[in-house]
Curated annotation (Swiss-Prot):
This is Peroxidase 1. Keywords: Calcium, Heme, Iron, Metal-binding, Oxidoreductase, Peroxidase, Secreted. Removal of H(2)O(2), oxidation of toxic reductants, biosynthesis and degradation of lignin, suberization, auxin catabolism, response to environmental stresses such as wounding, pathogen attack and oxidative stress. These functions might be dependent on each isozyme/isoform in each plant tissue. Its EC number is 1.11.1.7. Belongs to the peroxidase family. Classical plant (class III) peroxidase subfamily. GO terms for molecular function: lactoperoxidase activity; metal ion binding. It comes from the Eukaryota.
Length: 46
């Protein structure tokens, strides 16, 4: 059972790494889009 969990975890990690590598390739090295800063609920911190 433990071996199965390790194999599934490694497969998931490999899939995520592949997706990340593909995104970097398709976006020519970087993804650039604006991200709003600050709190989304409108409250201003002191």
């Amino acid at each position: 059972l433990v071996c199965f969990v390790v194999v599934v975890f490694m497969a998931a990690a490999a899939a995520m790494a592949g997706a990340d590598r593909e995104l970097k390739y398709l976006s020519h090295g970087g993804v650039d889009f604006p991200v709003p800063a600050g709190r989304l609920d409108g409250v201003v911190s002191r």
